[in-house]
Each structure stands twice: as C-alpha cells, then as structure tokens.
Amino acid sequence: MKAAIIGHGKMGREIEKILLERGHRIGAVIDEANASELDAAHLAGIDVALEFTTPDAAYGNIRACIDAGIPVVSGTTGWTNRLEELRSYCREKGGALFYASNYCLGVNLMFRLNRRLARMMERFDAYDVRIEEIHHTQKKDAPSGTAITLAEGIISEIGRKTGWVNEPLSLIH
C-alpha cells in the first residue's frame, strides 16, 4: 500500500513509523510547509491518505483528497460540526472517508460500553453524569474528540440530556 500522510506532527510521525515497519510505502508527506502539494498531481498513485492535522485544516485537506479520488482516513478532532456536510460531499463524488475520534480498540469498546451504561441510567433521574478528562500538557484540543464522543453517546441514550458544555465538559438537560 502506498500512503500519503497529511499532518506530520506527533501522530503523523507515529503513523509513518508503523506503516514503514509493516512494509508499506509513503508516497507523500504533506504538512503546513508544503500544503499546496495537496492536489491530484502530487497524490497520483496514492492508495490512501491518512489525515491527522488540525481542526482548521482538516475539512479542506479531506475535501482535496476526495477531489483527487483518494480514499481518506481521518482522526483529526475539533471540526466535526462539518462532518455530515463532508460525508455528503464524499458520497456525491463517489469517494471514501473513514472518520473516528479515536482509533484505539480499547477506547472504541469503551464508547460502546458508555452507550450501554447510559441506556441503563436513563431510568434513574436522581443520578447524573459528568465527564472529566486529564491529558498530557501537549494536548492540542480540549475537550478531546474522545470526550466529545463519550458525551454524544450519553446524550443519544439519555432523553433528558440535550447537549454538553465545556465548563468543564458537562452534560445539560
């Protein structure tokens, strides 16, 4: 497989290392310094683009890959208010987009358990739910995509919850 890495920060470098260890090839590495190379000509021959950038850049990066006919895997968080718009564009163009706020198997199992527990708590009005997270000092987005996904899972299962606020991240009703 020949991959393009879009975003060569902490996560992008880790992805590059894993891809190379597993025998895959890196066809392009695109970050802020060469963002203008995110086009069909520079992505020719790429099998998949792995996009882990910033909230401000993600939408445009993914759209450019879709326009170039390159399937995209994205893990950038903090921009998902436009995710449905982008998924619609992707379908319209016949593209492929896979997005997750966290790619860790254990965390995705936790997402499922979270929803199940929220369903169980629906009947207990006397109890409430709160999410508090602590991260390393280099964490760029807060709340994290993982915390937001957990909050959205709770909101989807507990009818009295209508949203969340970041003071710190709390569910509201």
Q: Which positions does each model-derived feature cover?
A:
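Rossmann-fold NAD(P) dinucleotide-binding segment
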Residues: 42, 56-75, 84-85
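N-terminal Rossmann-fold NAD(P) dinucleotide-binding loop
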Residues: 12-13
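Conserved small/polar residues in nucleotide/adenosyl-binding loops
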Residues: 172-173
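Rossmann-fold dehydrogenase core element
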Residues: 86-104, 121-131
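Glycine-rich Rossmann-fold phosphate-binding loop(s) that bind the pyrophosphate
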Residues: 8
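Rossmann-fold NAD(P)-binding glycine/threonine-rich loop
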Residues: 76-97, 108, 116
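NAD(P)-binding Rossmann-fold cofactor-contacting core
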Residues: 21-38
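Conserved anion/nucleotide-ligand pocket segment
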Residues: 109, 113-169
